[in-house]
C-alpha cells in the first residue's frame, strides 16, 4: 500500500468515525462579522447542542492594566456554559489536530495579531514573511483535515475604509487572505450583521 493510499484510507476512516459520532452535522463553520455584530453570540449558539465544548482563545495574552479588555473577556465568559473548557493558546494547528471534542475558536483576528507579533512582522524582522506563511499553512492543513465539529469566529475586514497605518493594512491583508482560504475549506460560511445571520453561497468565486 502506497503512502498516498494509506493517507486516503486513514482520512476515510476518520470521516467514518466522525459521522458515527456526530451524524451529518456541518463539521467546519466559519462565522464572520464586524465589531459588536453578534458573531460570537451566534457561534456560541451553534455549539450549544454539544454537551462538551473546548473554547479556544488564541489571541495575545492581555496585560493586567487594560480594564476595558478584561471587561470584554468577562462578558464572553459569563455567556458560556459552565461545562465548557477554555484553552488559551496561539498554537491553533496542534489544538485542532489533537482535538477530541468540538472546538469554538474565537477569534482568528486576534490569532493573526498574535502570530504577526510572534514572527516579528511588526518590526519587519528578517524572514518574517516565511515564518508567517509557515504558521498559516500549518493551521490551514489542520483545519482542512479536522474531524471534530469546529466553529471559527473571525472579523470581516474587507468592508471598511483602508487603514491609515502600515500595520493596520498588513493586518487587514493577512486576515482577509486567511478568511478566504478558511472559507474555501468550510462546510458553511455565515456572515453576521447587526445580529442577523446571512448564509453565504457554497461556491467560491474564481
What function would you assign to each model-found segment?
Residues 29-98:
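Conserved P-loop
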Residues 60-61, 110, 158-160:
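A short, flexible beta-alpha/helix-coil linker loop
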Residues 79-119, 125-135, 143-144:
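Portal/gating segments that form or line small-molecule/metal binding sites
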Residues 43, 76, 104, 155, ...:
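Residue-level signal for inorganic ion chemistry
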Residues 9, 15-16:
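Small-residue hotspots
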Residues 18-26:
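Phosphate-binding P-loop
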Residues 53, 103, 188-191:
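Short, well-ordered beta-strand core segments
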Amino acid at each position: 500500500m502506497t503512502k498516498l493510499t494509506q493517507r486516503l484510507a486513514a482520512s476515510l476512516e476518520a470521516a467514518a468515525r466522525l459521522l458515527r459520532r456526530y451524524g451529518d452535522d456541518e463539521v467546519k463553520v466559519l462565522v464572520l462579522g464586524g465589531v459588536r455584530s453578534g458573531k460570537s453570540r451566534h457561534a456560541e449558539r451553534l455549539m450549544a447542542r454539544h454537551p462538551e465544548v473546548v473554547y479556544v482563545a488564541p489571541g495575545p495574552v492581555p496585560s493586567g492594566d487594560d480594564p476595558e479588555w478584561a471587561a470584554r473577556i468577562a462578558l464572553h465568559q459569563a455567556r458560556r456554559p459552565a461545562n465548557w473548557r477554555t484553552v488559551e493558546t496561539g498554537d491553533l494547528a496542534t489544538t485542532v489536530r489533537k482535538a477530541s471534542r468540538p472546538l469554538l475558536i474565537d477569534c482568528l483576528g486576534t490569532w493573526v495579531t498574535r502570530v504577526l507579533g510572534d514572527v516579528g512582522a511588526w518590526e519587519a524582522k528578517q524572514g518574517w514573511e516565511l515564518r508567517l506563511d509557515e504558521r498559516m499553512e500549518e493551521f490551514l492543513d489542520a483545519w482542512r483535515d479536522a474531524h471534530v465539529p469546529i466553529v471559527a469566529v473571525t472579523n470581516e475586514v474587507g468592508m471598511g475604509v483602508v487603514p491609515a497605518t502600515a500595520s493596520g493594512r498588513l493586518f487587514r491583508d493577512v486576515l482577509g487572505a486567511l478568511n478566504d482560504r478558511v472559507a474555501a475549506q468550510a462546510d458553511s460560511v455565515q456572515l453576521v450583521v447587526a445580529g442577523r445571520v446571512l448564509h453565504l453561497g457554497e461556491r467560491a468565486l474564481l
